[in-house]
Amino acid sequence: MFIGRKSSGAAIDPNAQSFITAAGISNAIEIQAINELVLDLKTFSLWSKMLVVYPFVGGTAQSNSKNLKDTSFGTLSYSTGITHGSLGIKGNGSSYANTGLLSTQVGISQNSAASGVYMQSWAVNQTMAYGHFGNLTMYKGLPAIYPLLNSNLAPTYNPATFDGFMQMSRNNATNLIFKHKNNLATTFVSPSLSLNNSLRLYVCFANNYNGVSDWISFNYYSLGLTETDLVNMEIAVQKFQTTLGRQK
């Protein structure tokens, strides 16, 4: 087992090492990517805001199940039909990874929450990539993305492509910020609602709605993030994906 140093000689961050050990990762490039991600999140003062982070690295059910922020919390369990590989996890439209967590258990609040997903592609319309149906998910229609974050009023975002890093954040009762890749963030009116306390959060499938059959390479939940935070999150995650050779 790889302990203490990465291939470049830089010390491994203790939080990164905890994940590496729990995930059973031994590949030097993957270790480097995880270590740099943790260090970048700390440099950008984002680490303390993160609650659940699934980097989907290592290509196994074990490595893909672990939460980078706390490896003992939110460990994913899988239905049949989930594929694991170098690009992350892939469902079949009805399969899913179950966080075991309700929105009320993640650590977000009604007016302080953020979430994001990194997609290699998003091919099928009228599907949801993660979360749960109703008020915490991203929905792909035609030809738009509809982000829902503690609200049942989904704004409409029209991306140039349906791939890469998509993030949404709420810092108040009125507005939602949406950011796609390195494009400028957009603020929408989307009044907040109380957290859902009955549906668990899934990946590859939004609990109670059609799932995706595309590769998912990252998923996170955090406290509310500012526009600057979303920019920095995109920088850190895109660097992580680039190190792994799966950037979009």
Residue ranges and their predicted role:
Residues 1-248:
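Polar, enzyme-active/binding microenvironments
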